């Protein structure tokens, strides 16, 4: 499965009323440039996960990336 844009993930989320947004993993990755830097990268395929997208967040250590997923669980 590949990381897609947030807009594409939100369209998938709207098409499946029972889906929800959930963190894909617990790791934090240093932010590099924009979300497009992460789009297209491969992530492991997990049953029930419809899409994965990169989201920019910020804490006291600076900006980082959080991988979020659209799931059916």
UniProtKB/Swiss-Prot annotation:
Where on the tree of life does the source sit, at the highest rank? Bacteria
Classification via Pfam families: DUF987
Family per record: Belongs to the YeeT/YkfH/YpjJ family.
Name of this chain's protein: Uncharacterized protein YeeT
Q: Which organism is it from?
A: Escherichia coli (strain K12)
């Amino acid at each position: 499965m590949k990381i897609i844009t947030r807009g594409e993930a939100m369209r998938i989320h709207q098409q499946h009323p029972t889906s929800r947004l959930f963190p894909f993993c617990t790791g934090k990755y240093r932010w590099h440039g924009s979300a497009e830097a992460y789009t297209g990268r491969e992530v492991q395929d997990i049953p029930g996960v419809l899409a994965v997208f990169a989201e920019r967040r910020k804490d006291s250590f600076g900006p980082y990336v959080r991988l979020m997923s659209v799931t059916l669980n």
